[in-house]
Amino acid sequence: MKKTESKVSLFIALIAIIIFASVPLWHFDLNANRPQTQVVKKKKPKKKKKVVHKVTWGYPFKRLYEKKIKFKSGQKFGETDIIRRYYPTKSYFHDGYDFGFSEVGHSTVYAVHAGTVHKVKYAPGLGLYVWVISDDGYVEIYQEGFLSITDIYVKKGQKIKLGQKIGRLTGSHIHLGITKTDKKYIDKHGVPCRYYWKDNGTWLNPMKIIEDDIAK
């Protein structure tokens, strides 16, 4: 009887050991069948680089930065109230912009755009002028404002930067003309004034070009 009880007790003990030993396995198996939840780290959005516009045009006089000047019709580009040509047909077209002594004084003239001085010369109607050709195809003519060659600070072949001193206004006004190298702006005498009387796209509005660039 005692032997039988011992065998029963031993059997029960073995069963208990097997049960307890299997618990971790069951736990493992249950976890193995469960879907795994993966934590995904959100990527921080890349900061967009702000594109800063590099100004490449500027006013020919510092005073224009300081205050708004109201120019007269005759000083502005385009059709004006002043006749420019009588024969063979009348024309009121102005091929540039005039900056007068009354607005800017006898002050320093600054380069409105970078480029290379093509010529410093005299021509009837233009007076002493500075002819600049820029790498991007623009052409700038500073004319009618220099009474003496000593009023001009640059020379032929010189590379100039935006805002560099061109000379000094000593006349009544500086006429600034802007065109492009692909335009037929040179007359038969080699002077950069062809179609000065005609609004055919040869000459461009200087103030629009300058102020559009500054405003970007």
Language model features: what each stretch is:
Residues 53-55, 62, 152-161, 178-216:
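Acidic, glycine-rich catalytic/binding loops that coordinate metals and/or anionic ligands
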Residues 3-28:
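Sec-dependent N-terminal signal peptides
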Residues 153-154, 165, 170-174:
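Short glycine/proline-centered loop/turn elements that form peptide/ligand docking sites
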Residues 111-151, 173-180:
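Zn2+-dependent peptidoglycan hydrolase active-site motif and core
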Residues 30-128, 161-162, 171, 204-216:
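Surface-exposed, glycine-biased beta-strand/turn segments
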Residues 103-105, 148, 154:
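Short, solvent-exposed loop/turn positions at domain surfaces
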Residues 71, 123, 134, 187, ...:
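Acidic surface patches and DE-rich sequence motifs
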Residues 105, 136-139, 202:
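Short acidic/polar mixed-charge low-complexity motifs
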